Amino acid sequence: MARYKPNQQNHTDPKQQVVLPTYKLDSNLVLLPGIIYNVTFSRFKAATLLSRFKSQVSNVSLITNLLNEYDFDSKQEEKDDVESKYMPPPISSDAVTGIKQFYQYEQQFKGKNDDSSKVEAEPQSEFDWLVLAINPNLEKIKEPQTSSDDEYENIVTIARVIGMVDDTSNIKLTLQALTRGIKHNKVKPTQTNEVLIDIDWNSNIDDVASKYDVLNSKVLKLFRSIDGFIVDYRQALTVAASLAKKGKQSKDLKQKGDLLTLNPLANSLYLHLAASKDFTKAYISLQKLFGTFNSSSNTKIDNKTFLRLIDLTCAIIPFPNHEKLKLLNKFNSIDRINEVNRMLESMIQVFYNLKKNNKIINHWFYNEATNIQRANVVASQLKSIRLILEGMTNKPDKDIKTNQSPPRQLVRRGNNNKPAKSPMSDDGNESNDEYDDDEDDDDDEDELKAITSFIKGKLPNISTLSSDTKRLIVKDFKRIKSSPPGNSDFHVIRNYLEIVADIPWDRYVTRFKSNKDIDLEFAKKQLDSDHYGLQHVKTRLIQYLVVLKLLGINAEKEFEKIESENSKKSKKNESSSGSMGKNDKQRSEKTFTRSDDSIVIANNDETSIAHETARNKNKKSKSLTTIEKSSLNKSLMVSKNNKSPIIMLVGPPGTGKTSLAKSIAKSLGRNFQRVSLGGIKDESEIRGHRRTYVGAMPGVIIQSLRKSRSMNPVILLDEIDKIIGGNNGVNKFNGDPSAALLEVLDPEQNTSFIDHYLGFPVDLSQVMFICTANEASNLSRPLLDRLEMIEVGAYDYDEKLVIGERYLLPRQIKRNGIPNADLIDVDKSVMQKVILDYTREAGVRNFERSLGRICRFKAVEYSQSLEKLSEYQPKVEIEDLPKYLGLPFANLSTELFESPIESAKCGVVNGLSYNSDGSGSVLVFESIGFNHEGKSGSSSLNMTGRLGDVLMESAKIGLTFIKSIIYKNLLNLSDRNLSENLIDKINNMEIHLHVPSGSIQKDGPSAGITVALSFLSLILEKPVPLDVAMTGEITLRGLVLPIGGIKEKILGAHLNGIKRVIVPRENRKDLIEEYCRSTNDFNQLNDLLLDNENKYNFKRCEPEKFWFDKYGITIHYAREFWDVIKAVWGDALLVKVEQARMVEYHL
């Protein structure tokens, strides 16, 4: 039905007719073209409006999340009759065509495309589709001179939604008024809430310059009147304040005060003109706009700009709404010009009369009136103010007739002074609603309307609240209805009930319609697209989804079985009760379907639609059969048995733990809430404050439910190891917040979590909690026992390379304003150079910062190329990195393999460390010895390099073990005298052990074999190859014990050029697990572990081959220190050790 009309000579004829969706505002706002308005809607009304464009805005996440809160996709027959009657359907194909053609003509009208062949065929963005024909609410726009509303019933404003803000309670839509239109009521479209509209694109005006001069003179005169009024009003306020401060009066009239501040018209104008920042900003912009055309003789105004100035002037200047409606109704441009000139003259006259009358009353009050007359004037003003205030805060009861009560009787809403109500309802039946109020609850100004609606409409149907809890909430509601607003308990209980009503009871948001419809392939693709690697985390989530899917399938089969059994029982009961009378049968059915413990409170919402909907729901609830009730109970039982997992992601910073939680919520289609626990030291932050305290609020868990608008969100408890309390064993004055988390994170207890503020149990079993931590050792043992720990290890540089190419670089290109991804070319060699030489971390946070710096430099180069200052090169070369990122880190591998001149190579051994940031590195242990000639028994050991107590104890153990094997002559030395000389050498040697990087604290037991080998190398004067690194704890008997961080240490060894690594034999199972995880093949894990049980000779070497192929490192295992000596120097020194083993074996 949308079509173009050719241009015609008659200016009043429109140029376009289209079918557009319509909407009627609830307020008295009049939208004038050219202005952007921020309009606040309730969440439901905004969702109802935007649901009509659901297929066009499906990619806007903010709108999609809002629509997911309401079930707009259910079948029409499943809804209540009244509810479906007022539920607008999606826009029709005629409206879609109309929006497309409106968009095309809008582009041509704005002059974006002079060639009609280049006009875009349809809107380019999602918000371009949100075009509406806004009907003014004529019922709320009243004109002092009574006139018929038929004159304005066909006028509409064509507006587009260009923005949206969600403040968790309301939705604020930004509407851009585009042009005016007239409805064609004779031609009815195929769908309701749509209409054929004549669009006003006319901008033909004869002699626009002279008409602008007339408008400009009037506007400038009005500007002077407004500025003068604001100056006078502010001067009156200043004089009054100074006189009140001095406490005396002046004889000068200007210093005696000004009665302008007592004038209601002056107060209203000043509040509109000066008290609003938005008006001040718009008013200044309007002045500048007129000044632009007045100051420059070269700037000539065109027809479009002139007509836009008319609408802008009328919209910004504080004209009444009925005057704005008149201007909106002027379709003819000449009529519009005459109307705005008349309005300007009227407004100028208002300011002139105000100034003139104020001058007269000031002269009479201060110069002619007596003291009694002045007192009477002030008393009359105060009396008028009191009557107005009483009229604003009180309202007479609608049920009391005017002839039955004094005209001056004031009745407060919601008190106990309401008239007695008959115990019989209108239809003659007994009323069971003991909480039913009068019609004052229907008033839009009733501050308890939302609470009343919740108590009467939603509370009885909440399945997760017990009857005792509902009874306590209703009891508090009765208390607030019977107490005056001035009572202190009134505000406390009102805030409490508002928070209770704001919790999204029984609302579950998910991507899938039911559990049995869960799409596992979609979830896998979503997780893989958001994160690279982390297969063990993804596997755990997929397992959870599989469990949900199977439970949904089993529940559906169980429901069918229950229905078949109950249908057989009902048939038997019907056959056996055939002789029962009709009245008795009806009476028995009524008592059978009615539940004794149910609380049924009639809905008393603000509209008649809500009344009818509530009655239909009550009828439905009364007609529930036992089969339906058993199905609902069974569904609830299955949901209760399905506990959401409580996962803790442990790993170094920057490894994607927080973003992984967001990806989990996205794949499940649930709302996501992040709660930062770092630094929390008060137990009330978790469990809430008790209502008796001033400013009491619920805890972060309940607040997260309110923000997410659902009872099954994904809540991320970020940095749970940074919470104050936990494993330090210190009693806190404000309680232990980590202990408060025990109930929240226990699946057996969080079904009845009690927040101190609410005071009743809340079911958290459907909430998916994900915790993140850097160090699990900082958590208390009871809390750690409740969490399912998943370790997120450090990334190797291959994984960082893929992450940088797929995720980090495209994101930084977009964030830094690069219009096209092809404008920055970073190949693998450059990215690998950045990873190895400019970042040393377990995660990718600094890596992303480095890529961001490169993008910013390239953005500067690109902007200079646009100004033709230089030529732009997209490719980033390795030689450019020092210019972009500065100097690289020092290469430790050169320090390892290049020894200083004349330095002793003996006593230098490479160890492996696990750093605090989650990465691995190589530590060089240096030992130097001095012999004291002539002094026997003067050996000593000095250790430097900020070594911790555990590391120094390991060094002492290693030195004692080396002394013991030399004293026992267990090493195969060539000369006996050499062995005796070694004993004397040890007894008289002063050993100094140093670990470089002295500013870094070092501690831990994993350097035991490294230190022991360093001492042995020093004593035997036998150097250790520099391409060997080792890690492991040593005992006094020479056993090598397992340690942690094997993967990170091997990666650090590889980055520093190490070719051979010695690790404890017991750590081989960790390498096997990492091998299966990296290859994503856990089928052979059991076989590899069985083969690993042979401690001396395992047969399967796939893990070792994997590490060699990936990093070029040969792995050696050590059960005893002798295995370390064998891996470093061979079997030559161990002949006596093998002989001693054979003797011990025969014995």
UniProtKB/Swiss-Prot annotation:
GO terms for molecular function: ATP binding; ATP hydrolysis activity; ATP-dependent peptidase activity; serine-type endopeptidase activity. Residues 20-348 form the Lon N-terminal domain. Pfam families: AAA (PF00004), Lon_C (PF05362), Lon_lid (PF22667), LON_substr_bdg (PF02190). Residues 395-444, 561-626 are annotated as: Disordered. One of its GO terms (cellular component) is peroxisomal matrix. InterPro entries: AAA+_ATPase, ATPase_AAA_core, Lon_lid, Lon_proteolytic, Lon_Prtase, Lon_prtase_N, Lonp2_euk, P-loop_NTPase. ATP binds at G651, P652, P653, G654, T655, G656, K657, T658. PROSITE patterns: LON_N, LON_PROTEOLYTIC, LON_SER. It comes from the Eukaryota. Keywords: ATP-binding, Hydrolase, Nucleotide-binding, Peroxisome, Protease, Serine protease. It catalyses: Hydrolysis of proteins in presence of ATP. It is found in: Peroxisome matrix. Residues 903-1131 form the Lon proteolytic domain. Coiled coil: none annotated. This is Lon protease homolog 2, peroxisomal. It comes from Debaryomyces hansenii (strain ATCC 36239 / CBS 767 / BCRC 21394 / JCM 1990 / NBRC 0083 / IGC 2968) (Yeast). The lineage of its organism: Eukaryota, Fungi, Dikarya, Ascomycota, Saccharomycotina.
